[in-house]
Amino acid sequence: VTQDATFEDGAARPLRLVAMDDEDLQVLSALCQDAVFPASEMQWQRGRQRFGILLNRFRWEDIPVADRGRRTPERVQCVLAVETVQRVASQGVTQGDADTILSVLSVTYEPDEAGGGAVLLTLAGDGAIRLSVSELEVALRDVTRPYAAVSGKVPDHPA
């Protein structure tokens, strides 16, 4: 008896996603939850109106495969890039400090009356980064192979 192939049988492919509306951004936010990064891995290219972060993203999409294979959950390095950035503001973030590790809780969008708005990165420990944008365009792109999560565990958020 033969068995049909499943999606899990295929090789894992790097994610390359773009959010152009709030619904798309909710997907990116879920994928970025619990991503960690040193404060030194943020960069605003003012002339190109681009803000980017090199994240170490937890691979939420891989949990069923990891559980079934009884292997350690994984992380992957990815770039989160926000386009059309006019202004950057932060709270509770020491920029440029390689020893300060930040953790993403969510990525949301707050539209304004002028047709633009703000992309808000909410960080653990009351930190936040607010990116004023002329339009919503956020990309998430995996840039390395997955690696075993150092903790060996799935992130947990007890109530």
Task: Give the positions of each predicted feature.
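Short, well-structured hydrophobic secondary-structure segments
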Residues: 33-87
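Intrinsic, low-complexity N-terminal interaction/targeting segments
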Residues: 26-34, 90-121, 138-141
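Short acidic, gly/pro-rich beta-turn/loop elements at beta-sheet edges
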Residues: 63-65, 90, 131, 141
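Residues that cap or initiate secondary-structure elements
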Residues: 59-61, 86, 94, 113, ...
